[in-house]
Amino acid sequence: GKDIHLPERKTEKSAGYDIECGEDIDLIPHQVTLIKTGLKAYMKDDEYLAIFIRSSMAIKKGLFLANSTGIIDADYYNNEDNEGHLMVAVYNTKDEPFHVNKGDRVAQGIFTKYLTMDDDHAEGVRTGGVGSTGVK
């Protein structure tokens, strides 16, 4: 996207990559809003991207992720519903709208490896975007 910045860590010991809002948007009070980031993330099969709200957004602004922690699986990348574009589902706890400017850092992502059980035989195939894992 135009003028989209890749996430970056701000210090050498930061675990999370700061994720910016990809557009100007108003977060409606007491509702969930999907914030577009303009980003996609490719990962190896044994990795996922964990998305968290930035602590300053939660503590100072009353914003929370609607699902507590976003889990972006490796097979979300280039899915047929939305091509794997990352969105952040934010809940505004306040009684007034909250404006987020394009470029504001709203979340952070941490790339994580995971293990599977010895007898794991998952054969499902992602058939779309958010919440759409199934078998083709």
Q: Model-derived features: where do they sit?
A:
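DUTPase catalytic domain/fold
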Residues: G1-K136
